[in-house]
Amino acid sequence: MKKLAIGIDIGGINTAFGLVDEQGEVYAESVISTRKYPFVEDYPSYVADLSEALHTLCNELQFEYELVGIGIGA
């Protein structure tokens, strides 16, 4: 079974994220707007939208895999 990790890069304009293997090959990637959530009160909505986007991305893969880690950069 392929082992994949989630990578997330939180930027001031967009949050980019993807699924990569141990060799760094990217299997899927996407972005959501970070600017859509300018206030601390928007944080729960940001996390919910990011979580939904990650679930969608993971469901697009057409093979079995194991999530073994997550990395977040900001």
Predicted features, each with a name:
Residues 1-4, 60:
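Short, Lys/Arg-enriched, disordered terminal segments
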Residues 13-15, 53-54, 68-70:
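Short amphipathic alpha-helical surface micro-motifs
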Residues 4-46, 65:
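Short glycine-rich, Thr/Ser-proximal phosphate-binding strand/loop in the N-terminal lobe
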Residues 60-74:
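Short beta-strand-loop/turn "lid" adjacent to the catalytic site in phosphate-handling enzymes
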